[in-house]
Design a protein with these regions (language model features):
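Extended, domain-scale alpha-helical bundle/helix-rich regions
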Residues: 30-65
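Extended, charge-enriched "interface" segments that sit outside catalytic cores
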Residues: 1-34
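Buried hydrophobic positions in well-ordered alpha/beta secondary-structure cores of metabolic enzymes
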Residues: 65, 98, 116, 130-132, ...
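Core alpha/beta catalytic barrel or barrel-like domain that forms the active/cofactor pocket
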Residues: 57-63, 92-102, 163
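N-terminal glycine-rich flavin-associated loop
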Residues: 60-76
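Flexible loop/turn segments at secondary-structure boundaries
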Residues: 63-68, 104-108, 136-139, 154-156
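Internal maturation/activation junctions in enzymes
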Residues: 73-119, 123-126
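A short core secondary-structure module
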Residues: 127-170
Length: 170
């Protein structure tokens, strides 16, 4: 209750690696630029091939948040979050996460039960309240979360799901 904040402490080597990955700007260029960037994609592929999931998961999740914000985000949301998502300064960046999985469906997101109900407006768009429990999160300590939830009166399966941007700290 109250102001409980969950946090994860990473080993200093994680941050040293993150600084090297982000600060040259090449890997994040894969989602910083709107057009495909073959060099960034090749570097991501090579680092994945050698087992670097510790940062590749956050890079991929953040790319998803950027894509969703560009496609559907209000100008206010884009102004608030895109600069932090697109910076190459490791200590100033915002990371993205994905909360999709629920216990009853596993990887079958069409079976999701978490609900979203409209609750006014904020930042130039509809504000939603999310009710339910997610089972797994990719990049759990991220700043911004893409979360699926079932919208009121939506159809069964994946067509009844909405995708919501949730700041970790409100």
């Amino acid at each position: 209750l109250g102001d409980r904040i969950e946090s994860i402490e990473h080993h200093p080597a994680y941050h040293a690696c993150g600084k090297a990955i982000y600060e040259d700007g090449k890997v994040i260029a894969a989602y910083k630029e709107e057009e495909p960037n073959l060099l960034a994609q090749a570097l991501f592929y090579i680092s994945s091939h050698v087992g670097e999931a510790g940062h590749n998961c956050p890079v991929a999740c953040t790319a998803g948040v950027v894509k969703a914000l560009r496609a559907q985000g209000s100008p206010e949301l884009q102004a608030a979050y895109l600069p932090g998502l697109l910076t190459h300064h490791y200590v100033d960046r915002l990371d993205g996460a994905q909360f999709l999985t629920e216990v009853q469906g596993g990887s079958d997101v069409g079976a999701n039960c978490v609900e979203a109900h409209p609750d006014g407006e904020a930042m130039g768009t509809t504000r939603w309240k999310i009710f339910g429990e997610k089972w797994f999160c990719s990049n759990a300590d991220a700043d911004l979360i893409l979360m699926t939830a079932r919208v009121q009166d939506g159809p069964d399966g994946t067509r009844g799901l909405g995708l919501f941007l949730v700041p970790r700290i409100l």
